[in-house]
Amino acid sequence: MKGKEEKEGGARLGTGGGGSPDKSPSAQELKEQGNRLFVGRKYPEAAACYGRAITRNPLVAVYYTNRALCYLKMQQPEQALADCRRALELDGQSVKAHFFLGQCQLEMESYDEAIANLQRAYSLAKEQRLNFGDDIPSALRIAKKKRWNSIEERRIHQESELHSYLTRLIAAERERELEECQRNHEGHEDDGHIRAQQACIEAKHDKYMADMDELFSQVDEKRKKRDIPDYLCGKISFELMREPCITPSGITYDRKDIEEHLQRVGHFDPVTRSPLTQEQLIPNLAMKEVIDAFISENGWVEDY
């Protein structure tokens, strides 16, 4: 549980009225005790220590983010979210506060908000040159995939309702036409002619039903393929790569993203941290071929 050193006003209490010194631990000592408990996976006890540190000094953002992580480990996202928001009130540039807040919102299925906070955490980490490895990108990929799955589930439900509605309409129209045919031929003795007309009505509506089922089946088949494999997504933007290039470390990035990283953040590989210059980027032609084939077979990808 690393964090920048905090300045604590009145962390240690002095003597009062000539009495003996207060031996109770300072906020910093409570935080360090919480860190040790966290490493030992004693999350409730660690959270309690951070809570006592907050009581001692409620103006240090890292105490809240540390406790928020404990709450996340204990699967209590609501409590974690409250701590993250308080941490951001104290330090709006806190990477951990945005990161943990995004994780809380992911757990609570607030995918748009989760993605916004995780992207903010990623941007701040780059600006502050903090290395979180693949933790933030991994959480962002999960959030985007879950948001997409949520959209797909909603679409499936809407399509199912539409299919049921159209089925009822076709069935009702079939019954209406059959009843009308029967009324129009009341008193007629030519049953063969009536049966022939009814058969035509049945066949027409059977075809309507079959055509509709085929159309929905085609839509369903296309929908089943709506998933972009992780290996086709850039490790910086997390979107489908358009111009993949490979670094000497063997990592593939989308060219515009890695060039922006080199210009704005520094001349190093964002994953391996190895030194890297723009001249060392080599087009990954094999990956480009795979991506182009994927796009040609999945026109929906532009809306992903």
UniProtKB/Swiss-Prot annotation:
Region of interest called Disordered, as start-end residue ranges on this chain: 1-30
Start-end of each TPR repeat: 27-60, 61-94, 96-128
Positions of the UniProt region annotated as Required for interaction with FOXO1: 144-198
Tissue expression remark: Expressed in the brain.
List of residues that carry Phosphoserine: S20, S24, S26, S150, S274
GO molecular function, one term: ubiquitin-ubiquitin ligase activity
UniProt subcellular location: Cytoplasm; Nucleus; Mitochondrion
Gly residues composition-biased segments: 11-20
Basic and acidic residues biased stretches: 1-10
Keyword Signal: no
Catalytic activity annotation: S-ubiquitinyl-[E2 ubiquitin-conjugating enzyme]-L-cysteine + [acceptor protein]-L-lysine = [E2 ubiquitin-conjugating enzyme]-L-cysteine + N(6)-ubiquitinyl-[acceptor protein]-L-lysine
Region (Required for interaction with and ubiquitination of MYOCD): 143-197
Coiled-coil region: none
EC number(s) from the headed UniProt entry: 2.3.2.27
Positions of the UniProt region annotated as Required for interaction with MAPK7: 102-201
CDD domains, per the entry: RING-Ubox_CHIP
Mutation effect (P270A): Loss of E3 ubiquitin protein ligase activity
Record domain U-box: where: 227-301
Disruption phenotype: 95% of knockout mice die at birth, surviving mice have decreased longevity. Reduced levels of CHRNA3 ubiquitination in the brain.
Regulation: induction: Up-regulated by inflammatory signals in Treg regulatory T-cells (Treg).
Post-translational modification: Auto-ubiquitinated; mediated by UBE2D1 and UBE2D2 and enhanced in the presence of MAP2K5. Monoubiquitinated at Lys-2 following cell stress by UBE2W, promoting the interaction with ATXN3.
Its biological purpose: E3 ubiquitin-protein ligase which targets misfolded chaperone substrates towards proteasomal degradation. Plays a role in the maintenance of mitochondrial morphology and promotes mitophagic removal of dysfunctional mitochondria; thereby acts as a protector against apoptosis in response to cellular stress. Negatively regulates vascular smooth muscle contraction, via degradation of the transcriptional activator MYOCD and subsequent loss of transcription of genes involved in vascular smooth muscle contraction.
Subunit description: Homodimer. Interacts with BAG2, and with the E2 ubiquitin conjugating enzymes UBE2D1, UBE2D2 and UBE2D3. Detected in a ternary complex containing STUB1, HSPA1A and HSPBP1. Part of a complex composed of STUB1/CHIP, VCP/p97, CHRNA3, and UBXN2A that modulates the ubiquitination and endoplasmic reticulum-associated degradation (ERAD) of CHRNA3. Within the complex UBXN2A acts as a scaffold protein required for the interaction of CHRNA3 with VCP/p97, this interaction also inhibits CHRNA3 ubiquitination by STUB1/CHIP and subsequently ERAD. Interacts with MKKS. Interacts with DNAAF4.
Notes concerning its domains: The U-box domain is required for the ubiquitin protein ligase activity. The TPR domain is essential for ubiquitination mediated by UBE2D1.
Protein known as: E3 ubiquitin-protein ligase CHIP
Source organism: Mus musculus
